Amino acid sequence: MRAVLLRLAGFTGLPLVSILTPFLLIPIVSRVAGEGGWSTVVSGQAIGAFGGAVIAWSWNTLGPVEIAQNPSPQHRAEVYRQSLRTRLVLSALVFPFVFILAWQLAAPDHRLDGAAMSLTTAVAGLSPAWYCIGAGKPALLATFDALPRVAATIVAVPVILLTTHIWLYGIILLASVGVSLVIFHRIVVPERGKTFASRGGTWQYLRQHFGPAAISLSGTTYAATPVPIGQAFVPNAVMAGFSSADTVYRFGLFSVMALGNTFQGWTLEPQDASPKKRHTAAIVSHLALGLAGAAFLAILGPLATEIIMGSVNKAGQLTCALYGLSFLFISASTPFIRNLLLPQGRQRLILVWTLISAVIGIALMVLAATRGWADGIALAMALSEAILFLGLLMPGLRLLRKA
């Protein structure tokens, strides 16, 4: 238990700084952008999040398992080399796509802002976080994933205040992340000249791991679509508050990710402690986090958005409550997916339920958006997350009993 507490401190305490730092930027961006520009910025980030999932492919789900189960430095270096080859190929395709899509959906006066913000989230697909998680090294995660974002945000605050150009944040962040990735590569891959020497297996890897990647992509698709769908059909004045609720919700999801990072390596590593007890601890912890997050969003969400984004961008009570339900279900389903089903090769089951929930969720979102019902979009997302959780609950519990 001491080991997991140390990991919890590392994987939550250190990245917590990077989670909170953007709150320095949000009040500035939301006020500089105004109603129309704020929803454009959030829409661009959501589009980029989908692009980031494409770039990451299957590495965020299978990568930590591969690293955790084989401690050989040579093996880990080769795994990271393969990941870099595949992700750079995908980046060359994804970056232009998300930039153009965000540009097209943006408010006319904020096209460059929306397009640039799409790149700030798409670049997350190149993050080495999955490697650090599998290796159980939160200090690496903080140094090469959290710190570059913190530094970029601190630099961007005075730049945006002085220039009122939101798009400059995208350039600053991309530069910061790029430098950190080069340094990280030199640390984990000490042998020079081999990273790009073997390119033949890149497309083969992408084909072989399409299943796990599809799970991540389909899940990210419906998670990232609420604001872009609303942006296409709902007036900007209405979408301003909705976008604020979406932003607070997505910052909250970092806590789910951090807790999942803490438990994934711990539950999968060979240990004397009972696997069932470790899995149960992860499930209970995620459920408690989900309930706490849902309560916060439902009760304090409107106040938080008013303080952070300004009264003109304040989210409604119902919108926040529905986002709270989504938070609960996504937190509760995380340990079943990451710690039980995926390591046991149940990718097809996860993919089927993810696609079912995504299709239903997106269809209901579009239906609500075309009728101008913003809260209906949030309701559709909550329903889709509930469907996914319920569909995976019993298979996950059966695996837990066998652990």
Regions found by a protein language model. Give the residues of each.
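Interhelical loop/hinge segments that connect adjacent transmembrane helices in multipass membrane
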Residues: 1-4, 142-143, 166-168, 172-173, ...
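Signature of the first transmembrane helix
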Residues: 3-59, 210-237, 361-362, 366, ...
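Membrane-water interface segments that mark the loop-to-transmembrane alpha-helix transition
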Residues: 6-19, 44, 49, 53-102, ...
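Membrane-interface junctions at transmembrane-helix termini in multi-pass inner-membrane proteins
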Residues: 121-144, 327-353
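Hydrophobic alpha-helical transmembrane segments
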Residues: 111, 115-121, 143-192, 356, ...
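Helix-loop junctions and terminal segments of transmembrane helices
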Residues: 56-71, 248-273, 340-343
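Interfacial segments at transmembrane-helix termini and the short loops linking adjacent helices
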Residues: 35-39, 102-117, 299-329
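Transmembrane helix-bundle signature of multi-pass secondary active exporters and lipid flippases
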Residues: 9, 45-53, 242-261, 293, ...
